[in-house]
Design a protein with these regions (language model features):
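Helix-to-beta-strand junctions that scaffold the AdoMet/dcAdoMet cofactor pocket
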Residues: 83-85
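Short secondary-structure boundary/capping segments
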Residues: 9, 54, 104-107
């Protein structure tokens, strides 16, 4: 899944990325109070997807809400710990299970008193979260039922962390980085903004790493930064990830082709 995630964010054109294959608690220990926003698409029993894929029913019989509940609770606490003061965390599942939905919300609010629920923009067909056995009223959480709006079954809750936001400091770099001529020539042909100090060349591959994300030892990192391309025989060949991150306006020379043009397919 981590490699599929990497492919998706690269095709989407995300320039500032770090993809990990790591336990959330391990990530939280390195990035406490680091992120402005955290999105949790939690692993769940998938009750909301039964209509879409009935194979999930057998998976549910093997590993139901009780199995996933503890995993979700560990993830949501780790997510809150990685959030900056003033930051927002969105917790979502594709299950109807109260144990995995409202009970996970209460687990976070009980164990992290600096987190509170905030409103989600309403849409026609949204339903409120269920009341809990402990007497909590979760009107700000959202349930999506397939008989009330298009789609399957989902649960969403949006949290905010108390305190004032602050800007993370950039990681220090030593000295100036001299870029290979062929790389500099290509970069100069674009208006893409970057700091050469954060260019990292590994063998022939060229990466633009995040100024805020150091190379963390002990973490299973799939990709830290944007793959710009590869140095090949005195030329620089840009990657698809870099091409997707650039807009048309960032090229000094641009050729517009209609969709019907054969050269688009080739």
């Amino acid at each position: 899944r981590a490699k599929a995630l990497l492919k998706n964010v690269e095709v989407f054109g995300v320039p500032n990325l770090c993809v990990l294959n790591e336990d959330p608690v391990g990530i939280a220990s390195r990035f406490s109070g680091f992120f402005d926003k955290v999105l949790i698409d939690a692993p769940c029993s998938g009750e909301g997807m039964f209509r879409k894929d009935n194979k999930l029913i057998k998976a549910w019989e093997k590993n139901g809400p009780e199995f996933y509940s503890q995993i979700q609770r560990n993830i949501i606490l780790a997510g809150a710990d990685m959030l900056k003061p003033g930051g927002k965390l969105l917790y979502s599942t594709c299950t109807f299970s109260k144990l995995e939905d409202e009970d996970s919300v209460i687990h976070l609010l009980t164990n992290r008193p600096d987190m509170h629920l905030i409103d989600i923009k309403p849409y026609e067909g949204f339903s409120h979260g269920f009341d809990t056995d402990e007497g909590y009223h979760l009107e700000k959480a959202v349930r999506i039922f397939p008989h009330k709006m298009p789609g399957e079954g989902h649960f969403v809750a949006l949290f905010e962390k108390d305190g004032e936001d602050y800007t993370s400091s950039k990681r220090p770099v030593s000295g100036k980085t001299k870029l290979p001529d062929e790389l500099k020539e290509f970069m100069d042909s674009t208006t893409f903004e970057y700091d050469p100090a954060y260019i990292n060349i590994r063998d022939t591959r060229v990466f633009l790493t995040s100024p805020y994300m150091a190379e963390e030892r002990g973490l299973r990192i799939i990709r830290n930064g944007l793959l710009l391309g590869e140095l090949k025989k005195n030329r620089f060949e840009p990657s698809q990830a870099f091409a997707m991150a650039l807009t048309k306006d960032q090229f000094n020379n641009c050729l517009d082709l209609p969709v019907s043009d054969d050269r688009v397919i080739r």
